[in-house]
């Protein structure tokens, strides 16, 4: 079964994320559990936790259908010790918030070397950061997102994801989220079913589908291999509809949150309905 949704706003209270997801007939959703552009957040209150859990229960969302995202400020591979410590503390807090909310996944961007350390050193720091966070939490899986490779961001090669996983001690609590826009911008073609087969055969060989814990379904304004992260609505960008239809018809993508981060929230309900329809329709757009 496919879990299909979008990254919805939690403005006004975390419970509102579940309500907004239900309003667009989503069977999955993503959210930030705190302001993603601030380091610190007030601790979760018992009321906030209870209201969130009640809303998820009311609208039939289990933790397997929810893919929270951490703050954009966090860099788990930071080359400077003090800044790395700050990121690690913030990441632990994000994991603990998920734990309190009964959530089992936390999606994050791996990190950046900032042109100050080698890729290898940065990847090792990211893995060590994950180990520290897993040691201080229970029940939450760290879900590494592939990146477009802008600037000094790592995670744009499947080999980067595999290297991080290799350095994580508890393999049962690490996974990956593949963003289609990021993959395309990083040089993994998805424009035809044949290219999708090739890209995900590479993924299966290098990382492994057992680690796939979520997807971000985004078309790309950016061009193929450009290393530029610019999302677009499904079928309106440089990837096109075929990739998303192909994903919907492949059971390797069952049972994980498939999350839209496309640019027009007003058509998320239509995009979700279209994706659901592709599971059975074999040809037409």
UniProtKB/Swiss-Prot annotation:
Q: Which residues cross the membrane?
A: none
Q: Which residues does Zn(2+) 1 bind?
A: 69, 109, 145
Single GO molecular-function term?
DNA-(apurinic or apyrimidinic site) endonuclease activity
Q: How is the cofactor bound?
A: Binds 3 Zn(2+) ions.
Could you tell me the EC number(s) of this protein? Answer: 3.1.21.2
Q: What does this protein do?
A: Endonuclease IV plays a role in DNA repair. It cleaves phosphodiester bonds at apurinic or apyrimidinic (AP) sites, generating a 3'-hydroxyl group and a 5'-terminal sugar phosphate.
What protein name is recorded for this chain? Probable endonuclease 4
Judging by the UniProt lineage, the source's domain of life is Bacteria
Per its record, the protein catalyses: Endonucleolytic cleavage to 5'-phosphooligonucleotide end-products
Q: In which family does this protein belong, per the annotation?
A: Belongs to the AP endonuclease 2 family.
User: Which positions are annotated as binding Zn(2+) 3?
Assistant: 182, 229, 231
Q: Which GO terms describe its biological process?
A: base-excision repair
Write out the entry's keywords from A to Z: DNA damage, DNA repair, Endonuclease, Hydrolase, Metal-binding, Nuclease, Zinc
Q: Where does Zn(2+) 2 bind?
A: 145, 179, 216, 261
Stored Pfam families = AP_endonuc_2
Q: Which organism is it from?
A: Escherichia coli O127:H6 (strain E2348/69 / EPEC)
* The gene coding this protein: nfo
SUPFAM superfamilies, alphabetized: Xylose isomerase-like
- Needed cofactors: Zn(2+)
């Amino acid at each position: 079964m496919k879990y299909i949704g979008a990254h919805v706003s939690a403005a006004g209270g975390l419970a509102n994320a579940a309500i907004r997801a239900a309003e667009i007939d989503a069977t999955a959703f993503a959210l930030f559990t705190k302001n993603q552009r601030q380091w610190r957040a007030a601790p979760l209150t018992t009321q906030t936790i209870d209201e969130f859990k009640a809303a998820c229960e009311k609208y039939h969302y289990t933790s397997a259908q929810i893919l929270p995202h951490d703050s954009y400020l966090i860099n788990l591979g930071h080359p400077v010790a003090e800044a790395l410590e700050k990121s690690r503390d913030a990441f632990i807090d994000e994991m603990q918030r998920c734990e309190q909310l009964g959530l089992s996944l936390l999606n994050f961007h791996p990190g950046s070397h900032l042109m100050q350390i080698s890729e290898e050193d940065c990847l090792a720091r990211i893995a060590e950061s994950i180990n520290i966070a897993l040691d201080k939490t229970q029940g939450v899986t760290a879900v590494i997102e592939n990146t477009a490779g802008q600037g000094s961001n790592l995670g744009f090669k499947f080999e980067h994801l595999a290297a991080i996983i290799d350095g994580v001690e508890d393999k049962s609590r690490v996974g990956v989220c593949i963003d289609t826009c990021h993959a395309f911008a990083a040089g993994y073609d998805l424009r035809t079913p044949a290219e999708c087969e090739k890209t995900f055969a590479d993924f299966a060989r290098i990382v492994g589908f057992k680690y796939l814990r979520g997807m971000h379904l985004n078309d790309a304004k950016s061009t193929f291999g450009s290393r530029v992260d610019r999302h677009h609505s499904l079928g309106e960008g440089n990837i096109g509809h075929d990739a998303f239809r192909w994903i919907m018809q492949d059971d390797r993508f069952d049972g994980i949150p498939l999350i839209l981060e496309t640019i027009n929230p007003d058509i998320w309900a239509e995009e979700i309905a279209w994706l659901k329809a592709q599971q059975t329709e074999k040809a037409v757009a």
